[in-house]
Amino acid sequence: LHPFKKPIIKHSMSEKKLNLLADFPAVSAQEWMDKITADLKGADFNKRLVWKTNEGFNVMPFYRAEDIENFPTTEVKPGGFPYVRGTKANNDWFVRQNIVVTDAKEANKKALDILNKGVNSLGFKVDKNALSPEYIATLLDGIDAECVELNFQTCVRKSAYLMDLLVAYFAAHQYDVLKLEGSINFDPMNSMQLKGKKLAKDDVMEMAKNIVLSAARLPFYRVIGVNAVSHNNAGAFAAQELGYALAWGNEYLSSLVDRGVDTSLAAKKIKFNFGVGGNYFMEIAKFRAAKWLWALIVEAYQPACRRENCELTRDGICYCAMKMRLHAETSAFNKTIFDAHVNMLRTQTEAMSASLGGVHSLTVLPFDAPFKAGDEFSERIARNQQLLLKEESNFDKITDPAGGSYYIETLTKELAAQAWKLFLEIEDKGGFFAAIQDGSVQAALTATADKRLKDVSSRREVLLGTNQFPNFNEVAGAKVSPVAGCGCNDGAATLPVVRAAQEFEALRFATEAAARRPKVFMLTIGNLAMRLARAQFSSNFFACAGYEIIDNLGFASVEEGVAAARKAHADIIVLCSSDDEYADLGVQAIELTKGQEILVIAGAPACADDLKAAGAEHFINVKTNVLESLKGFNALLNI
């Protein structure tokens, strides 16, 4: 063919269009099941292919169109009630970065800088003792409040004062209040859970009423926070986070209405701050279900519409008030100190879940947040993770791509059912305030955190770089510094302060602090494939505690391997071979190491009982609890 001429193509059967539905016979669900059953060759379908989630429902290996027939979510369009597909027709979201304000002028300088780098939402954590008109003027100098979402957090007892300062500042600068968007994160119930403070409900709700009435002057400012992110950071499963959040929000809404606040106004002043974790599709479903269920809750109050010519008013009912305002922040629970750059991968998938799930705004925390304040590099990466999704991947141009997905629609429905069940349980017991007062919410989340830590310790829940495939030579060094606890606890129950990686990290910190780093020697011998596989497994196993790993290609005899281990001054010798060879090689290793090195046999051989009788004490395999085993070795090594 000439390189600059189109080839001549003769058309015949290729002109016929392929019709997949007509040209291929339909396959029924039963036919799929029959095929799967045959391929399993007698293995249990439920054990092998059905995912038993922590959310209280099972996930099947495949779904079909008939599985989502008559779902209440599938006929809804983006922007339509009950908003499962989003509260607006587009999927644009605010890119938020938080600033802890220690000096108003410096914070303003930083805010102006990052606004020129892609941020369009600012989160200021302000000092309650510094609040004044001059402080706000300095903090917001040069920032166009009509173009930037402004969010604030301060002491709950100063929140109403902060609201008044903002109203006065906006009026002085002649801003159009209909173009101002932002929030004040007033949430005393969050303080009760985090700090163990004992507050009276009447006092809390009276403060809430005052700030809501003050904020009525700013129609698009939300001033009541529902900080479900605190539950997420404490290890909550998605159904728990959502169910408690609904009860939390309803506690504020019902209490405000009971105190005479207009229902529509009260609902429009509540903002939900969720965490977003690494369970990718479940998180997308969580945000979809959250918008759906909150719309149903607010609808039950029949809020009256106060706006003239509102397109969403039906029979005088305000459907705008039923739209959840949803902010998301990447979870702290699954972030790690060691191999911290993996946190970038975690926050990237979390940002994807949140954006595809239709959040209003999103904060991606810097990858180094577990051990230090973000610096210029880590904050830039965190911003760019969102900008990449917008500018390169166009996630903001596609609204609810999960809509119609057999899998995600099913997850949404099932997760909503579990969350609704929990919501009703809380309501039946007197509401969310009562549940945190008696400590039942904190107790439930502590139990969940304990389960997740146990799953991490046994590798049922994997943290790359921490309990699986660690960086063998990484040293924490100056990464870790002590964190002072809050001194304002009144003795009430609190949420667990926990990260999934913390117990493994404690092992490595202890190893670093030891006088000498333990050496683990891989005595590889016999069957090539098995010895390599078990050496790799064992190396990863012991590296999780920060031990020095000495791997080897193989030895001709156990004697040669033990001699090499002693020459290397090994503390632990791991025998890596095949099950069939352990009956002989294991006994030899036991005799040669007795009373000197710690001998570990990699695997679960059939001859394990015989080896134990001969003196073997330590075996590691895929069923071993990694954390507890490593704690035991630390104890043997006096670490």
Positions of predicted regions on the chain:
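A glycine-rich phosphate-binding loop feature that marks nucleotide/adenosyl-phosphate handling sites
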Residues: 50-58, 185-189, 227-233, 268-277, ...
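Catalytic alpha/beta active-site cores
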Residues: 13-279, 283, 304, 309-310, ...
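Short, Lys/Arg-enriched N-terminal segments with co-localized hydrophobic residues
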Residues: 1-12
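Short glycine/threonine-rich loop-to-helix capping motif typified by GTGT followed
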Residues: 236-243, 277-289, 331-344, 372-382, ...
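Conserved phosphate/anionic-ligand binding catalytic regions in large, soluble enzymes, centered on
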Residues: 52-61, 113-121, 342-368, 403-407, ...
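Mobile "lid/hinge" segments at catalytic clefts and subdomain interfaces of large enzymes
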Residues: 211, 216-255, 345-423
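Intrinsic disorder at enzyme termini
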Residues: 14-29, 48-51, 57-83, 360, ...
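Glycine-rich anion/phosphate-binding loop at the beta-strand->alpha-helix junction
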Residues: 249, 273-374, 381-382
